[in-house]
Amino acid sequence: MKIEVDSFSGSKIYPGRGTLFVRGDSKIFRFQSSKSASLFQQRKNPRRISWTVLYRRHHKKGISEEAAKKRTRKTVKHQRAIVGASLELIKERRSQKPSDRKAARDSKLAKDKEAKKAAKAARKAEKAKAVASGASVVSKQQAKGSFQKVKATSR
């Protein structure tokens, strides 16, 4: 004796009971009662209808043997070296006090600022030297050859 399962409610359908619905794409749906068939045709979600097996499963109703819970794997963080920084260097930086780190950052910023200022001064001096030597200052447009208007010759 083959016992079928209701496509909507999940309840058992014994031989000689229920109806069969074959959709246009040849998928077969079995319904235990006209109630579940009607709800299926209304496109109701069986997980939201409280008497269906799917609802009970979804809301964990009537499950008494919950002793064996599923074991989940815990993710463990590992420190690994990055390209350009060894593990020791990373650990050393992590263990630094925030005040020390801030002081190091400030000193580096000051050093970079000084280097930038020096480079700017050097460029300025080079430009002044070029002007003093009497080199003619040519604008970019003149160097390219500015647009020359063609004179009309028809008159």
UniProtKB/Swiss-Prot annotation:
One example GO MF annotation? structural constituent of ribosome
The record's subunit annotation is: Component of the large ribosomal subunit. Mature ribosomes consist of a small (40S) and a large (60S) subunit. The 40S subunit contains about 32 different proteins and 1 molecule of RNA (18S). The 60S subunit contains 45 different proteins and 3 molecules of RNA (25S, 5.8S and 5S).
Annotated localization: Cytoplasm
PROSITE patterns given for it?
Answer: RIBOSOMAL_L24E
Annotated CDD domains:
Ribosomal_L24e_L24
For this entry, list what GO says about its biological process. Answer: cytoplasmic translation
Name the Pfam families for this protein. Answer: Ribosomal_L24e
Region entry Disordered: which residue ranges? 87-155
- Has the keyword Signal been applied to this entry? no
Q: Organism source for this protein?
A: Candida albicans (strain SC5314 / ATCC MYA-2876)
Q: Which UniProt keywords apply?
A: Cytoplasm, Ribonucleoprotein, Ribosomal protein
For bias kind Basic and acidic residues, which ranges apply?
89-129
Q: Which InterPro entries match?
A: L24e/L24_sf (IPR038630), Ribosomal_eL24 (IPR056366), Ribosomal_eL24-rel_N (IPR000988), Ribosomal_eL24_CS (IPR023442)
Query: Which family, according to UniProt?
Result: Belongs to the eukaryotic ribosomal protein eL24 family.
Q: What are the annotated GO cellular component locations?
A: cytosolic large ribosomal subunit
> What protein name is recorded for this chain?
Large ribosomal subunit protein eL24
| Known function | Component of the ribosome, a large ribonucleoprotein complex responsible for the synthesis of proteins in the cell. The small ribosomal subunit (SSU) binds messenger RNAs (mRNAs) and translates the encoded message by selecting cognate aminoacyl-transfer RNA (tRNA) molecules. The large subunit (LSU) contains the ribosomal catalytic site termed the peptidyl transferase center (PTC), which catalyzes the formation of peptide bonds, thereby polymerizing the amino acids delivered by tRNAs into a polypeptide chain.
Composition-biased stretches, type Low complexity, lie in 130-143
